[in-house]
Amino acid sequence: MSFSSQSSKSSAESTLQKFLSGIVPVEAVQAGKARSQSKAQSVNNQLKTRALSADEVRRLQKKAKLKQQRKLKKQQEEAKKVNKLAKHQIIKSHKENNELTVEEEKYLNKIVKRNANSLSRLSEIEDYELKSELESLQEEILAAQRKSNKKTKQKSKKDFNEKLKRGKISYPGLTPGLAPVGLDDDDEDSD
């Protein structure tokens, strides 16, 4: 019997020895135990014999480095969020107490401008001419897609019919060389 590893072999031997201890005298079983290694020793031997290749080492190092970079990036993002939140809280409290510094006022104006610009970009679509141009462009794109879909459907149908004629594929309900199902022989005689 071949074993995939030394630990599985020693495990099988110990199980067999336990089973046979009730049948065979104890001295014979103990002689077999002296030969076998403990599980810890067999695992240790396996680890020593298995050496990592250079590619495996490089891959493992790369994985560890990427994991560490992700962790560092996440920590930096969290720190930025905390700093930004703290800064906003300080500015809010200073504004309520009318104690804004020049830099805080500039920062607040910058945020207001940024938010106003994003709102104005969203509201520009409300312009009727721009809206109509966007709709016409969408219609053109959809028409082009429908046209290409129609061409591919026609081509696939044509290919299917050709394969059916050549006999490369079979179609349910058609039996080669026989009359279609449900057709009586009397109908053929009347022709």
From Swiss-Prot:
Q: Which UniProt keywords apply?
A: Nucleus, Transcription, Transcription regulation
Keyword Transcription belongs to the record: yes
Q: Where is the composition biased (Basic residues)?
A: 60-73, 82-91, 147-156
Q: Does the keyword Protein biosynthesis apply?
A: no
Residue ranges, annotated region (Disordered) = 34-91, 145-191
InterPro entries recorded: Rrt14
Q: List the disulfide bonds.
A: none
Bias (Polar residues) occurs at 35-48
Q: Which GO terms describe its cellular component?
A: nucleolus
Q: Short name of one Pfam family for this protein?
A: RRT14
Q: Which domain of life is it from?
A: Eukaryota
Entry's localization field = Nucleus, Nucleolus
Major location (coarse): nucleus
Stated family: Belongs to the RRT14 family.
Q: What does this protein do?
A: Involved in ribosome biogenesis, probably through modulation of rDNA transcription.
This protein's name: Regulator of rDNA transcription 14
Encoding gene, per UniProt annotation: RRT14
